[in-house]
From Swiss-Prot:
It catalyses: an N-acyl-L-alpha-aminoacyl-tRNA + H2O = an N-acyl-L-amino acid + a tRNA + H(+). NCBIfam families: pth (TIGR00447). Its EC number is 3.1.1.29. It comes from Streptococcus pyogenes serotype M3 (strain ATCC BAA-595 / MGAS315). Hydrolyzes ribosome-free peptidyl-tRNAs (with 1 or more amino acids incorporated), which drop off the ribosome during protein synthesis, or as a result of ribosome stalling. One of its GO terms (cellular component) is cytoplasm. TRNA binds at Y15, F66, N68, N114. Belongs to the PTH family. It is found in: Cytoplasm. The keyword Hydrolase applies. It holds the Pfam family Pept_tRNA_hydro. This is Peptidyl-tRNA hydrolase.
Length: 189
């Protein structure tokens, strides 16, 4: 069995600290905590790090396809490793949630998120585990694109840092317990 934890974002230093890259930030924190290193895999169009936890292989993935094509990398890896959809978790930003709010779900629509739209289109289902991190709505007069491509202010950065620690703990808990329902009960809120 293989589990796959995917963080959504855009590759390149230009996007590194943007709100839309919260999934990449989460994966970076998780692999740092678990002392896992990434390799660039051109075949899968992703950066991949893997380790074994409880005798199961766990792949940590940052698609390098850019957000709107994330489903290409996710589908390729699910197919190659024959990963059951219940063993997939996708971490991403949600602008309909307050900054730093954490929400775990086992299914749902894309909610306007193009990375999630791409994954749903490529894997053919909305029923996969996700961890959403709130980035808040744009300020009055600001476009959504400018908001998601902007960086967090100092105050929000502190809150997001604490939330990313909770994401690390949620993923580690899930990998130990092998129970996303139990993980949702413990970490939602």
């Amino acid at each position: 069995m293989v589990k796959m934890i995917v963080g959504l974002g855009n590759p390149g230093s230009k996007y590194e600290k943007t709100k839309h890259n919260i999934g990449f930030m989460a994966i970076d924190n998780i692999v740092k905590n678990l002392d896992v290193t990434f390799t660039d895999d051109k075949n899968f169009k992703a950066q991949i790090g893997s380790t074994f936890i409880n005798h199961e292989k766990v792949c940590f993935v940052k698609p390098t396809t850019f957000m709107n094509n994330s489903g290409i990398a996710v589908k390729a890896l699910l197919t190659y490793y024959n990963i059951d959809i219940t063993d997939l978790i996708v971490i991403y930003d949600d602008l309909d949630m307050e900054v730093s709010k954490l929400r775990l779900r086992s299914k749902g629509s894309a909610g306007g998120h193009n990375g999630i739209k791409s994954i749903i289109a490529h894997i053919g289902t909305q029923e996969f585990n996700r961890i959403k991190v709130g980035i808040g709505r744009p300020l009055k007069g600001m476009t959504v694109i400018n908001h998601v491509m902007g960086q967090f202010n100092t105050e929000d950065n502190i809150a997001i840092s604490l939330t990313l620690d909770r994401v690390v703990n949620a993923v580690k808990f899930y990998l130990q317990e092998n129970d996303f329902e139990k993980t949702m009960q413990k970490f939602n809120g």
